[in-house]
Amino acid sequence: MSLLVVGSVAFDALESPYGKVDRTVGGAATYFAVAASFFAPVSLVAIVGEDFTESDEAIFRGRHIDTDGLERAAGKTFFWAGRYSENLNERVTLATELNVFAGFKPRLPEKYKTSKYVFLANIAPDLQRDVLKQVKGRPKLAALDTMNYWIERTPSDLRETLRHVDILMINDSETRQLSNEHNLLRAAKHIFKMGPSTLVVKRGEYGAMMVDKRGVFCVPAFPLEEPHDPTGAGDSFAGGFMGYLAGAKDLSDATLRRAMIYGSVLGSFSVERFGLERLRVLKRNEIHTRARHFAKLTQFKL
């Protein structure tokens, strides 16, 4: 089934101890769409400026990504620059230029309005809610990402939007901030009262955790000798997770657990190079091979 994603397409300038790139295509919706397209067709809604060329858009071609929802506006594309510390865990933002993204008002093409799987990437909660209103009927699965900025600045708007989604996908610090609870399991109980029935906590180098009424499932981060750039890891994880679910067409506990593995697989490939360099050349057989390696990471007998 087709998977709708609404979020940012951007240009990034990235620097880490492993090198730097001055201008590369990025943005949450970009990483998500590329990762998800390995499993299911993706419908993309985002905005770019006049400086976003045909060659920049090439990342979406040949990947079952429909870009009819990619709006082009007068002005420049959203730009972000950041530098990572030696261990890649700390990030300094060097520049944020919203440009045309500041006026982004998502409008779904008619053919997108019947999407059964919806992912609302990190944009203002009122815009996320407006997207859901444009979808005809209740999606089979709606998931949402947010950040500390919206938790702090628009808490009421965020709470209202959370009432309409099934899955909340955020990192551990955002989970604690949203719930006012340090323990992640207790935090999940608070968040369930806000609307979502499933919480997926992205924990960086410590992996990811899924909590729902059936229990807890944790996956480790895949061990890598030389990770280069964590910028798109979380969005690639989300893309792998949601893409697998859309492709599987069922939401059983076993399917959700496998989706966690495939999300972690896509996130691990993303960090191997700068920007989208690794996902650009990634093959499906590599994904499935790494998924099998994931299974062996914690396999043991009692």
For each predicted feature, which ranges?
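Short beta-strand scaffold segments in enzyme catalytic cores
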Residues: V34, W80-R83, G207-V211
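Alpha-helix C-terminal capping segments
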Residues: A33-V42, Y244-A246
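A short acidic, amphipathic alpha-helical/loop segment
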Residues: D56, L127-Q134, S156-E160
